[in-house]
Amino acid sequence: MKKIFAIVTLLVSLLVAVSTGFTATASAAGQQYPSFVDGAALVQPVDKTKLLSKLREIESKHGIRCAVLTVKTTQGMNIRDYAQSVQDQYFANAPKGSILMVISMDNRKWHITTDKTMRTKIIDDVVTGDLKDAFINDLKKGRYAAAFTNYGNKVDELMTYYEKEGEAYDPSKKFSFGAGAVAAIISFLIGGGVK
């Protein structure tokens, strides 16, 4: 019972802390829930402005929420659960879906979460593959503004693909010309040997 009480208390404090941070930032930005909240102070002010503008442009273009949140700590919460909680509380209201990247500096972890609608447009394999690959090197090197910009650019690219093709980008459906050539050679060899 004490563990359950501790977990509930932790979740309530987490939501109050995040809510307070969003409210303060939202008032300054004139937006209800900002697309970029740098609670861990990782990005220079000039880069914050550019990044916020970029994320808003992506959101406007595609009718989605595309956000980045940095925090000093998740207050002991698993990064995935923390990201999902923030997603559900602040970004799950976009009719065409939402995607959120959360970075916690206390344990140097990050997580990208999508809502149900967005999962039909950017599949989980792409989030952990192509999307991650777009920003991970800059993130590891501490080039946070570049990492977040690359994240936004890749989300924009994936959403453009979805809007053009009518389906989510799926790397497993790409045709491999190398595999096709090998298959052609093998079938030629087998076909030539059978008479």
Positions of predicted regions on the chain:
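C-terminal segment of classical bacterial N-terminal signal peptides
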Residues: 14-25
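Alpha-helical transmembrane segments
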Residues: 188-195
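Positively charged n-region of N-terminal signal peptides that target proteins for export
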Residues: 1-11
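Folded, non-transmembrane soluble domains that reside on the lumenal/extracytoplasmic side of membranes
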Residues: 23-184, 188
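Intrinsically disordered, low-complexity segments enriched in polar/charged small residues
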Residues: 7-8, 15, 97
